[in-house]
Regions:
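Alpha-helical recognition/docking segments in bacterial nutrient-uptake
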Residues: 1-15, 77-184, 188
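Short beta-strand segments enriched in small/hydrophobic residues
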Residues: 26, 33-36, 70-86, 185, ...
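Short acidic/polar active-site loop segments enriched in Thr and Asp
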Residues: 30, 76, 133, 191-194, ...
Length: 344
């Protein structure tokens, strides 16, 4: 049996892509009106917009924003690189990213930074392959190339860190000042010194909180007691509390985060030390108040949502020419609970 030649074969039905012209024809309007409706222009009457949108739905028309972005050289998108997506404060920062992006008509693209050690260059390379106008990097740890990193031309870059970079804008909560506030507060309450539960040495925020603790005690002529190293978890705080419970001179403990502070309280109590009657405890981040109902921890509250909004505002503002490097530190607020005793 002779086979069909290509010429003899019936052609498969080809679905024709829907164009602006098709939508305009069905809606009975101009192509310019369709374009204005897509961008929600106030110059188009509501009833006309509804007619155009009905035609778009009927025809299955989807605006080609990607093509428009390529033509304009702008994607209206900010890339966010995180080392630890579930880290304390990151969800609030994401809320800030989203709120600012919505305000500017931008979208957010999220990527996770891996690698040991990770670098800003690797984050930048990944972002350069994506349709983004700028990137935000949350620096939980010190990148190996922090001192040598140069952002790509046209890639507005904001780093979430207290460390200032000559070529990138930076924003963060003031990790040093939160420790100063805590130590000053406890000393004003009559405590002679402040013990400290630190965190993993690779953590940037933890290092800055430790530095603030040391320098504030030194400023008052007090030699800092030996710190206890934790790992951000309540379990490490529990172990630290048990260890510090055996020190009769310990009347005040400052933990690097709320999880360790709550763990510390349980550790102290397991050894018969009462909080705050025997030992005062203060944390940082105000992240667990809704989760631990039986205790109002004295802590420092951070505005991570504001951090996220500032970062995206900076990148979106670059579209209007505000592209200079800036550095922003947002102070925390000391929130008094029921875990500190006044010894005066």
């Amino acid at each position: 049996m002779a086979s069909l030649t290509r010429k003899d074969r019936p052609m498969a039905a080809v679905k024709k892509s829907v164009s602006v012209k098709d939508v305009a024809r069905l809606a009975g309007v101009s192509e310019q009106t369709v374009s204005r409706t897509v961008h929600d222009s106030p110059s188009v009457r509501p009833e006309t917009k509804e007619r155009v949108r009905a035609a778009m739905r009927e025809l299955g028309y989807r605006p080609n924003f990607a093509g428009r972005s390529l033509r304009r050289g702008k994607f209206k998108t900010v890339g966010v690189a995180m080392f630890n997506i579930t880290g304390t404060g990151n969800l609030d920062r994401m809320e800030g990213f989203a709120a600012a992006a919505d305000k500017h008509g931008y979208a957010i693209t999220l990527t996770k930074v891996d690698g040991h050690p990770y670098t800003l260059e690797s984050a930048s390379s990944r972002m350069s392959a994506l349709p983004v106008d700028g990137m935000v990097v949350i620096m939980n740890r010190m990148p190996a190339d922090f001192g040598t990193f140069e952002p790509l031309p046209g890639m507005q870059t904001v780093l979430v860190t207290m460390l200032e970079h000559p070529l990138c804008s930076t924003v963060d909560n003031d990790q040093f000042d939160c420790s100063r506030q805590v130590v000053e507060y406890l000393l004003r309450q009559g405590h002679k010194t402040v013990h400290f539960i630190s965190c993993p040495e690779r953590s940037l925020s933890g290092m800055q909180r430790e530095e603030g603790w040391r320098e504030t005690l030194h400023a008052h002529g007090i030699e800092p007691p030996r710190l206890v190293r934790g790992d951000w978890t309540a379990q490490s705080g529990y172990a630290a509390g048990q260890a510090l419970a055996d020190d009769p001179t310990c009347t005040a403990i400052y933990a690097s985060n709320d999880a360790m502070a709550y763990g510390c309280i349980r550790g102290l109590e397991s050894r018969g030390r009462r909080v705050p009657e025997d030992v005062s405890v203060v944390g940082v981040d105000d992240s667990l108040g809704d989760i631990v109902p039986d205790r109002r921890l004295t802590t420092v509250r951070f505005d991570n949502r504001r951090v996220g909004m500032w970062a995206v505002d900076k990148i979106a503002g670059a579209e209007g020419g505000a592209s200079g490097v800036e550095h922003m530190l947002i102070p925390g607020v000391l929130v008094e609970g029921d875990t500190v005793r006044d010894l005066r």
